[in-house]
Amino acid sequence: PKKVDIFRTTVYEINGRIDVDGNAKLYHVEHFIEGDYMKYNSNSGFVDHKTCRQTPQAFSHFTFERSGHELIVVDIQGVGDLYTDPQIHTVNGIDYGDGNLGVKGMALFFHSHSFLNFLHEKNGKFICYLFFKCRNW
């Protein structure tokens, strides 16, 4: 198994700073990530066909399966397998900001690639393998 990580962020509220609606302004801050920054997929179905890496797509797919098909983590970007600023789509389309496209966003993710999945038994444990192939439009 390959390890992935989501970069830790901080949110700041600066006293006296308000938006046009009178709400406190919030600032999302994170450390600089050294290396070649890549966007692997988006919340609207984009997949980088130049790299079409397996791990980011598998991570998104894993979040869908692990949540019982209730949500999916997309908009995977970062350096290598250190991801930053993900977006979450939920079945009901509620929470997680304006980028939550709900079931439509989930469908866009699955439309962007095809995958082959099979189980393999090893030492009495079943391992699920997913192989992704980006669709070239």
Give the location of each predicted region.
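Short linear interaction motifs
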Residues: 51-67
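Catalytic-loop of the protein kinase fold
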Residues: 63-85
